[in-house]
Design a protein with these regions (language model features):
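Short N-terminal signal/transit or membrane-insertion segments
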Residues: 65-82, 125-128, 140
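Short acidic, hydrophobic short linear motifs in intrinsically disordered regions
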Residues: 32-34
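A short, well-structured edge-of-sheet supersecondary motif
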Residues: 112-148
Length: 149
């Protein structure tokens, strides 16, 4: 059993190193925190995701540091490693979330032009709502979120 843990730990360390290298665009063995956060956002994961509370709490404790080393990166991910691993391996429910949201924006713009129909007047709360109000929200099982309107 102990051997299995060592193998799994080595495997996790390798994948974390791979993720780090993918974000290491400046070649200085440091990554820019903003790039990591942008990667989260592009995949539909936000600051409001409770699984990322520890991650963002640690970032806030860094007092404005812009770049981090591999060791700091590894410590940041430790409590959300499974989520980050799914994200970096494009294994979230919607792997190319950015492309997906672009398509949704196009559909939303087309549907919003449709002025047919009426607001449901048999629901008292809806009677008072403007027929111009229109919104769309998506939340996947992995917690990827996107909203318009």
């Amino acid at each position: 059993m102990q051997n299995h843990k060592k193998i799994k730990n080595k495997s996790n360390q390798k994948s974390t190193a791979l993720f780090f290298q993918n974000l290491n665009r400046n070649g200085k063995d440091r990554i820019i925190l903003k790039d990591l956060i942008n990667h989260l956002n592009e995949n539909g994961l936000s600051k409001n995701d409770p699984r990322l509370n520890s991650f963002f709490s640690k970032i806030n404790q860094m007092n404005g540091i812009n770049e981090i080393t591999f060791e700091e990166f590894d410590k940041l991910l430790i409590e959300s490693k499974d989520l980050f691993e799914k994200m970096f391996r494009d294994q979230l429910v919607i792997p190319e979330f950015k492309k997906f949201t672009h398509q949704i924006q196009k559909i939303y713009a087309q549907v919003k032009l449709n002025k047919n129909g009426n607001v449901a007047d048999y629901i008292p709360q809806l009677k008072k709502v403007s027929s111009e109000n229109f919104a769309l929200s998506i939340c996947t099982l992995d917690g990827q979120r996107f909203s318009l309107g």
